[in-house]
Amino acid sequence: MEDIFNFFDKPKDPLHFSSIKISISSPDKIRERSFGEVKKPETINYRTFKPERDGLFCAKIFGPTKDYECNCGKYKRMKHRGIVCEKCGVEVIPSKVRRERLGHIDLATPVAHIWFLKSLPSRIGNLMDITLKDLEKVLYFEAYVVTDPKETGLAFGTVFSEDQYQKALEEYSYGFEAGMGAAAIRTCLTSMDLDQLSEQLRIEMQEATSEAKRKKTAKRLKVMEAFKNSGNKPEWMILECIPVLPPELRPLVPLDGGRFATSDLNDLYRRVINRNNRLKRLMELQAPEVIIRNEKRMLQEAVDALFDNGRRGRAIAGPNKRPLKSLSDMLKGKSGRFRQNLLGKRVDYSGRSVIVVGPELRLHQCGLPKKMALELFKPFIYNKLEERGFVTTIKSAKKMVEKEKPEVWDVLEEVIKEHPVLLNRAPTLHRLGIQAFEPVLIEGKAIQLHPLVCTAFNADFDGDQMAVHLPLSVESQVEARVLMMSTNNILSPAHGKPIIVPSQDMVLGIYYMTREKHFALGEGKIFASADEVNIAWDAGEIHLQARIKVRMKNLVSDEKPTLIETTTGRVLLRDILPDAVPYATINKVMTKKELSNLVDVCYRLAGNKETVILADKLKAIGFRYAAKAGISISINDMVIPEGKPAIITRATEEVQEIQNQYTEGLITDGERYNKVIDIWAKSTEDIAKEMLDNLSRDTILDPEGKEVKVPSFNAIHMMADSGARGSAQQIRQLAGMRGLMAKPSGEIIETPITANFREGLTVLQYFISTHGARKGLADTALKTANSGYLTRRLVDVAQDAIITEADCGTIDGLTVSSLTEGGEVIEHIGDRILGRVALDDILDPVTGDVLVPANEEIDENLVARIEAAGLEKVKIRSVLTCESRRGICAKCYGRDLARGHLVNRGEAVGVIAAQSIGEPGTQLTMRTFHIGGTASRRAEQTALEARNEGFAKFININYVTNSEGHHIVMNRNGELAIVDETGREREKYGVVYGAKIKVSPQEKVTQGQSVAEWDPYTMPILTEIAGRVKFGDVIEGVTMEEQVDEVTGLSRKVIIETRDADKRPRITIKDESGKTAKIGDSLLARYYLPVGSNINVLEDTEVNAGDVIAKIPRETTKTKDITGGLPRVAELFEARKPKDFAVITEIDGVVAFGKDAKGKRKVLVTPELGEPKEYLIPKGKHISVHEGDHVRAGEALMDGSSNPHDILRVLGQKELAKYLVDEVQEVYRLQGVKINDKHIETIVRQMLRRVRVKDVGDTNLLIDDQIERWVFEEENEKAMDKGGRPATAESLLLGITKASLSTESFISAASFQETTKVLTQASIEGKIDSLRGLKENVIMGRLIPAGTGLALYRNLRMVAEEPVIIPEPVEPEDEEIYEEEA
């Protein structure tokens, strides 16, 4: 009887476990877990559809096909539960056991597991020290392996071919044992003594002379240690029996028409069973060795195909010619188990529909079609109907809902109240792609979306669809409301600025109402209060844009009311402002930028609730006035500037002039091309400038009849100026000149399109345009995929970066200063330190007062104080220097950008960082085609103009004065500063080698004066001394060729690569006596010419100091688009070595040149103390340092990009992090995308997690082992506690893919990439996954250990002490107090 009651029990909770282990299964384990051996390849009986006995679907082994019913039908129903039928041997239990019961196949001969054989590096091969090629020969019966050498002196594991084996037999006459196939390998593996072997290998490793030998030994040792420590036995890599998957997981489904659909696995198992049975029979019949060998080989191949089809040889195909899906394929790739079913599942209680705009919604609402709501909230409705007594059973409730009776709608209204729903728009690129709203029931079938959240979803209403999800449990509803509600996501997690900002029409409306119109109705009137303005406006006495004066009191402070110059519209706008926001914030023309600023100020001063109310009011007022303004554009609004023809004529003449110079041979073709492009780029800019000036100014008559220029109300200009739609770039194409276009390859076509869209394009111009436009479309498709993949890799590497503690107590941090480029500050120090935590006390440089105490968050007010004090550098805490073992501490991270306060524990900052970097990647990729491929190339900077007046100051510049009296810079990294009277630097510029400086040291400089100029397209080689030119090793056809220009017929000498290692083309300068001139005391005036340089002088001519003797052309410029972008970002995060990376010096010292070696040039750097270091630089590369130059560690000795690994090695982690952060930021800055530095730092931290062991000391580590930094530190602590010698290691920089694959969690790594490889390695090591990251917990179906799932929050308990009322003096009982578990 009890059994019956138990049957209706609630289903058991899933197992509670804290970690999961993977290891190799032993044959005994497989048999132990199996419920019987599968002996026959039959599946089901095709007439009765009953499973065949002992077959692949056998009910005796795997359980009954129908609940509580045996196969022959003798026992049916629940009362016979647990009985085994004596006729058919089937147990009477529920049929769902067919999903979990395993069978097995006993193999007639052992076979190798293909993962351990073929997954590189081959584990079996590694252990036995046999190459994979030989190992395959043995396993597939083409060669013998020595399993026991006995006294013959043969090495254990030697591989013999058939002939060699016969010879050996004759020689040793059976004094040894050898075999072939997996059985022989198994014998070898069983007889291995791992302890003794690993000792031997350790000794070998210490004695190893060559690097290669050491590495090989280390690899073997690693596999051995893994087997030793995990308790796996090597012979388990060879299978004696194979487990058979439960039949429900490889179903056989009858289709109509008597055919069957089957899982590929059944075919693969059938082949294995057939071959196995055949082999057994052949062995019983004692067939000839050849036949048995062949059958064994076929069995090995069948098992290989079952485990990993296509890994070896050709994949086995099914009847329809496509490869069968093996067990490995079930796990691998996008449609494998991990990514398809475990990381992303389809869910119920969801629906999707097209979205339309809902302008009358509040920010926290969305419009939900009644039909959808009825379906989504069904169970809730049934429940309510029953509660209300409308129905008595669920069935009748169902009928009632189907008929859509009026009561149902009333109930639905009630159910829906206060029950948030989640809206999601694919692709969900960052966390704002899913937000919670309160549903409002609407007619129709489209979801209504609030216009202000479109930016976050990146949604528009041209047919986008969105999905609705319903949070069911109370906890999930609370989280949706508190964390995900659109009103709680006003700030963007990527940069901390508001993301809920009016856009498009709303901006235009507010812009229009805050503009000033000269001489409008009511101009100059003075009002006593804002209310009076409202009355006058309602009465139609004043114009919306009239300039008026109003007496206003400051609501923020108690100052006296003052007269403020303003306009009617701005006073009207003030009505919607919260009191805390000062009027000055809106007393200006409100562009999109200003509106964003307004929302930001409101959030900081008035708080979240007020901001939400303001946002909704802005939306309403914006739409209202946009409608009132009635702005529309006509073709006449695109005013073509009058000066356009003149500019084009001038440019054409200049181009002709350049062409003439080229024809005369004064410049090379490359220079000509670059200059032509420059002229056109500049002309396009000029026309654009004039056009924008025209558009933005109108000329009108004032009351006296005089002409005055006033800001224009041109519709196109207003749209672009307000930031509502369109950009200067697009207007330029409409009314200016289309400009230069790029070829698909990225080069710029040198004939520009001089027409604009208003004038119309000629056929040729149209044709050139199509180039760029098509490239834009093609790029978009490709880049979206690339960007998505980048995001996926970033998320994977950073997913376990979670805020785990409040403060790690580190004393380390980063020094941050303003970012400058070309003397211009691109990012102020304030923007970089906002929301970070100060490392030490920040002191005022003048008074020494503490501006910010140590470990305090630097907020907006403190930033203002720091900037006012004029601090140039600030030390802050950083994720990079955080010492938390797992995760990151809140103090090192700083402010949670989306919330505006210090980050909470449990915040998944890694994923947020990955999304913040990845999301704009996709946006940017999609942004290319809007401009339609117009080449946007800045005219290269060729001169420096002083921005301030002052005195010129040369900072380590070596220069010579040429014949014209200009100073020519002769070294790199010199700087030119402008200082004021007090000697304070106002601006500072780097000057390049070969630049002409037009001022002398200490000379007075006026503002706007040109102080230096240079040629950006070539890199000159200059002579430092006057004399006669002599060539050395400049031999035509060997090291130099005369290149004749087809167009001009003129030739020039170009240095080419030579086969002859001894030839080194150079130019020497001789003095009067014919000797090589000396520069200073010791240096010879000898200049080596790199490959590709053009010689500018003739032999035996006189040159002066500072003259150019040769030029190295720079590449023709390509347009900068985020193509330089996305791949560049990926390259940085993958830590790839650039193609031609520069050799950098590892020490400070003085440069000297040594003798050439192996066709490379030798550069010596000699420090003040110690040995000189030598660097070899390939010939033909331009060496950018000169003899006698001082260089600093980390400086490049030649042209080329930096190699991040070198930076880490030479300059350390902080410099590397700075380099990576700056480089990534530069790519995004080019696109105008803001990302906070800390996100990039978070990713870089994950890339720097590991170290490589250099010296093992007295620890258990292996040399060259790559391990987590904290594991290394722990091992060292252990060794030092015992008084041993610690190990040493060097920092490693891993690319994001590598870092993801080398995480501790094998589940996370396997679900990312290279599944088989990861699982193979993990099972050998017997790895334990302690489920610490997010991904592995999602896969195991648990709550993630972040956010509200953090243990810290899961274990909170309420403590309630109830007052004890004692009526009579009774024996008091103990009160129960629930302790809070921290």
Curated annotation (Swiss-Prot):
GO terms for molecular function: DNA binding; DNA-directed RNA polymerase activity; magnesium ion binding; zinc ion binding. Keywords: DNA-directed RNA polymerase, Magnesium, Metal-binding, Nucleotidyltransferase, Transcription, Transferase, Zinc. One of its GO terms (cellular component) is DNA-directed RNA polymerase complex. Gene3D superfamilies: 1.10.132.30, 1.10.150.390, 1.10.1790.20, 1.10.40.90, 2.40.40.20, 2.40.50.100, RNA polymerase II, clamp domain, RNA polymerase Rpb1, domain 3. It catalyses: RNA(n) + a ribonucleoside 5'-triphosphate = RNA(n+1) + diphosphate. Zn(2+) 2 binds at C808, C882, C889, C892. Pfam families: RNA_pol_Rpb1_1, RNA_pol_Rpb1_2, RNA_pol_Rpb1_3, RNA_pol_Rpb1_4, RNA_pol_Rpb1_5. Binds 1 Mg(2+) ion per subunit. Its EC number is 2.7.7.6. Its cofactor is Mg(2+); Zn(2+). Zn(2+) 1 binds at C70, C72, C85, C88. SUPFAM superfamilies: beta and beta-prime subunits of DNA dependent RNA-polymerase (SSF64484). The RNAP catalytic core consists of 2 alpha, 1 beta, 1 beta' and 1 omega subunit. When a sigma factor is associated with the core the holoenzyme is formed, which can initiate transcription. Belongs to the RNA polymerase beta' chain family. DNA-dependent RNA polymerase catalyzes the transcription of DNA into RNA using the four ribonucleoside triphosphates as substrates. This is DNA-directed RNA polymerase subunit beta'. It comes from Geobacter sp. (strain M21).
